[in-house]
């Protein structure tokens, strides 16, 4: 499907215009500044152990939305300014997300090891909301290979998490981040629209984002993904290349394009923004599962390449890697089932 090339001059009465985009970006920039203030206030741990993590998630969430708006509606903005701001937002969002990603990956792999061993799962390393106490069955110890694999993964990912934490602290105190915060503060009060963009229609830009998503989905092997247990995700499982699987790339790209499409729908159209499509939300959830499983499989494979590990440890890591690739396959199947579903109009 050929992408649409919107014309800023095209607009019709009653449709969302560049003025609505300016209000949307200003609101998202204000959310970014509010999250930044919250992150600074919770940095001393006064709000609990999970306070800084919640603030970092809020900061990343607002950064993603500002960045998505600058990308989708770039033609209505100062292009050089939009590109520079997007690059800086991507930097800060990626830097802040590394620590959480390492912790979540470790939790995922340890839970999978215990599940594959038929034992009681270990407690998560990521803080969870308090729940009522439950009676758990007695823990069964892991086998030697699984226990050593768990210890190896814990060492590697805990070290990576510590480095990511230090990197985030360094980034937040850097002149580069302060310059970005100043730029977002200006955006909260004055959105740099292109000349004549205040009255331009946003519809063609949002439609172009949807077209990019549709084209990327059409290139996916959805027919294969729609067959359970097709084992496509396990292809090249013994490749000596430690890099992520090339077959995962198009799925990751669809995940990003789906997020851009969902965020574009949040920009007010007329009186109010449309309600979130549950089909898009479910598809995004499936692609998040795909990303998490693919990255966990890479972590298991990299750990298995550690020099001088015992055969039992390497075997446990190999089983763990295959398990996560099966999770990749299951996520692709879930996405295919969700995407092929059509919303039935209400009667």
Whereabouts are the PLM-identified features?
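Cationic, histidine-enriched alpha-helical/coil surfaces that engage anionic ligands
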Residues: 1-347
